[in-house]
Amino acid sequence: MKKLLLTVIQIALLFIFARLINWVTALLHINIPGSIIGIVILFTLLHFNIIKLEWIELGAAWLLGELLLFFIPSAVGVIEYGDIMSKFGVSILLVVIISTFVVMVSTGTLTQLIAKRKEKKHTCSSEL
């Protein structure tokens, strides 16, 4: 029961933090979405131990675990615009497939380059 209460409190804190950042970005007329700024600020606060990971870990883990639930409204929105999907559905699907493929290839290539660079660095340092 204590873990559940702690999780709910942490989710509430994350929600309040998100709303606060969205409010500040709207107030300052910043063109970057509040969610992006919030992620950067939260990462910075965590990195410098201003916010301890334990303070938000359970809530964040639950939110990540239930992430699929947050995409249901988007799926319902797609279904609501069936006429647009019937006209452009194939094009949208092709864009999604091609962009996913490009991201996968780019990520794989970059990962291989980084691994080779680390291997080369490790080999050079062991020769000394």
Swiss-Prot record:
Please give the PANTHER family that the UniProt record associates with this protein: HOLIN-LIKE PROTEIN CIDA, HOLIN-LIKE PROTEIN CIDA-RELATED
Instruction: Give the main localization category.
Output: membrane
* Compartments reported by the entry: Cell membrane
Q: Which InterPro entries match?
A: Holin-like_CidA (IPR023760), LrgA/CidA (IPR005538)
Q: Which Pfam families match?
A: LrgA
What role does it play? Increases the activity of extracellular murein hydrolases possibly by mediating their export via hole formation. Inhibited by the antiholin-like proteins LrgAB. In an unstressed cell, the LrgAB products probably inhibit the function of the CidA protein. When a cell is stressed by the addition of antibiotics or by other factors in the environment, CidA possibly oligomerizes within the bacterial cell membrane, creating lesions that disrupt the proton motive force, which in turn results in loss of cell viability.
Disulphide linkage map? none
Its BP terms in the Gene Ontology are: cytolysis; killing of cells of another organism; programmed cell death
Identify its membrane topology class.
Multi-pass membrane protein
GO CC annotation terms, alphabetical: plasma membrane
Which family does the record claim for this protein?
Belongs to the CidA/LrgA family. CidA subfamily.
Q: So which domain of life are we looking at?
A: Bacteria
Q: Which residues cross the membrane?
A: 4-24, 26-46, 59-79, 88-108
* Keyword tags: Cell membrane, Cytolysis, Membrane, Transmembrane, Transmembrane helix
Protein name stated in the entry: Holin-like protein CidA
